[in-house]
Amino acid sequence: MLKTYPLKMMMTSRIRIMKTTINLIIRSIPMENQYYSHLIQRGITMEVKCELITPIFIGCGEEYSQLDYFIEDGLAHIIDLEKAVSDLDDLEKVDYISGLIVSNIDNNRLNLTAKDILESVGLNPYDYVIRKIESEIFSNKKTRVKKFINQNNTYYIPGSSIKGAIRTAYIFNYYDKNLPELLKILDDRNIKLHDKGKELEKNAISKDIPKDFFKYLKISDSLNLEGEFKFIHTKRWNYRKKKFDVPINMEGMTKGTFSINIKIEDEFFKNINKRLKTNYNPKDDEKKFDILKNLCNNFSKTVVEFELKKNNPVYVEKSYEKLLADINKDDAIYLNLGFGGGFLNKTVYPLLWKNDENHLYFRKIKSLFIALSGGNKNLKNAWLKANSYLDFPTTKTVYVKNNSAIAPLGWIKMTLVE
């Protein structure tokens, strides 16, 4: 005998299935890396203030679909659709909603908002708004929006994201001093193409995971986050075509500050000294911070100098010019976090450009990346057309407002709190 479920339970289950199905129908989006909270031990020695220079987005792999929000008067109203459907107390209306949604999908796009759906069955959408957020996305743009990472609906910046950026900066500095080692790994045919990145990291840090000295660098998740969050619009600027393509909407932090705690154990600097042939022996927080600053800014400066050689939109160019001037003041750490930093901020590619003015290694690098592109025709064609380091990457994701490119994404300034 079949078990009879309560009406509301059936409806809740049905709406969950409906949302999952619609999300699959509309578009399948690759999951971004999940960021996990970095648990920090007691005995923190440094408090660092972080200030946004340009908008930042760190994703959690989830999105707001058109079933989750509607935009009105410059605000995105986030709604609880499951609660609304549960309140209907009528399976026929649930089925009506399902049919309405399916019949309004055109070219993989849903031409309805959550408000349209609720009003179609006599519900007041404002009764189900769980929060509001400023929106720079126009109300007629029915689109999916990438979610900012959060825990229990509270935004945060993962310490792991900052630590990862510092790790990349260190690897850059290591090969800046040991370029022949980098070239040897790239040349080594015994190392599989897709393993070369990992091998570069292991060679610079440790081939034995338990001996990874970055375990001595501990960074907390954001504390006292005071930020302005909005639905924002980004687009990819195509350097060759000198125009925009591929719009991406996201929930971004556009302004604000937050604090982090950093603990650096002595073993971290002992390993840095061994690897970089330095003689660091910091006795206080200021000296420890200065060492991190030198590592990070050497990398960030090279990235920005590379970016300034590219054909950027006017306001983006000005943003980079100011950023470079600020880095040269040498009074803070400058890092790029999250989405939009792209290829340059996640690899040692700018290092090759920096150390190869005569393009002696470029053909080798080009061949390597053509091979790594595999079945990605667009990526392969981009490399086939590249005649210099500056010909790649071919696109750059930038923050767009009122149809103008305003700034690159993800840059922060970090200062020591005394």
Curated annotation (Swiss-Prot):
One of its GO terms (biological process) is defense response to virus. GO terms for molecular function: RNA binding. Keywords: Antiviral defense, RNA-binding. It comes from the Archaea. InterPro entries: CRISPR-assoc_Csm5 (IPR010173), RAMP_III_fam (IPR005537). Signal peptide: none annotated. Belongs to the CRISPR-associated Csm5 family. NCBIfam families: cas_TM1807_csm5. CRISPR (clustered regularly interspaced short palindromic repeat) is an adaptive immune system that provides protection against mobile genetic elements (viruses, transposable elements and conjugative plasmids). CRISPR clusters contain spacers, sequences complementary to antecedent mobile elements, and target invading nucleic acids. CRISPR clusters are transcribed and processed into CRISPR RNA (crRNA). Part of the Csm effector complex that includes Cas10, Csm2, Csm3, Csm4 and Csm5. Encoded in a type III-A CRISPR locus. This is CRISPR system Cms protein Csm5. It comes from Methanocaldococcus jannaschii (strain ATCC 43067 / DSM 2661 / JAL-1 / JCM 10045 / NBRC 100440) (Methanococcus jannaschii). The lineage of its organism: Archaea, Methanobacteriati, Methanobacteriota, Methanomada group, Methanococci.
